[in-house]
């Protein structure tokens, strides 16, 4: 939407895709630069979008972009200071990209860890029995412990929260406010599947660049299928 587009690179000019061998690829989505589709976006609007989800925030304690500086630089430094205050680690030599950008690695066949230093999301996908029209998606958080041993916490194993088909991701309190993004991302899956099955040729045509990761995975799967069954 327009609000998020103020601070997120939402089109191909603001995203990068990399492929590493047969079993890993990466997506980097730039944060702190507006969508090229929007014109005349002020730096303060960009920073407000990053931290507050809105392009115009009226609050006495909000972070201000100094005259002549870029929101991306200011936001990255604010993140460094916040992380150091939270866990005691030194982030002064970490890049702006590691502080802000959405960096996602896909490791074949079913593992997707986020990179960078914010609290990291991990995705894992597994078969749902023998159903070809269903799968299990797991979302987990990883977070660094405090650098000071005296301040480190003993973490107990977290029980799995299974969502029913009638629940939304946003119903999971464990996702601490980002579940609605999952719900938005998954809202079009039924239409995507119908479109796939409606192909008259029975084949799929991938976009040259933005869907290169999908093509990469299918090429790897084809290589394994061509080898035939594994021999004991």
Model-found features: residue ranges?
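Single conserved hydrophobic/aromatic residue that forms the stacking wall/gate
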Residues: 1-12
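Substrate-recognition/cap regions that form aromatic- and gly/pro-loop-enriched pockets
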Residues: 83-178, 185, 189-190
């Amino acid at each position: 939407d327009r609000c998020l587009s103020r601070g997120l690179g939402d089109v191909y000019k603001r995203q990068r895709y990399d492929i590493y061998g047969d079993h890993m690829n990466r997506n980097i989505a730039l944060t702190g630069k507006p969508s090229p589709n929007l014109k005349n976006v002020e730096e303060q609007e960009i920073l407000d979008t990053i931290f507050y989800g809105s392009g115009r925030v009226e609050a006495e304690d909000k972070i201000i972009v100094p005259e002549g500086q870029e929101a991306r630089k200011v936001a990255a430094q604010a993140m460094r200071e916040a992380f150091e205050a939270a866990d005691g680690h030194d982030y002064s030599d970490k890049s702006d990209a590691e502080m802000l950008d959405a960096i996602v690695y896909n490791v074949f066949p079913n593992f997707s860890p986020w990179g960078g230093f914010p609290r990291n999301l991990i995705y894992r996908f597994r078969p749902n029995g023998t159903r070809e029209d269903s799968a299990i998606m797991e979302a987990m958080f990883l977070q660094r412990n405090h650098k000071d041993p005296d301040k480190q916490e003993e973490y107990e194993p977290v029980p799995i929260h299974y969502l029913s088909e009638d629940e939304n991701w946003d119903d999971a309190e464990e996702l601490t406010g980002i579940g609605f993004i999952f719900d938005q991302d998954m809202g079009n899956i039924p239409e995507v599947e119908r479109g796939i099955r409606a192909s008259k040729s029975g084949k799929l045509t991938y976009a040259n660049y933005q869907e290169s990761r999908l093509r990469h995975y299918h090429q790897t799967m084809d290589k394994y299928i061509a080898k035939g069954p594994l021999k004991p």
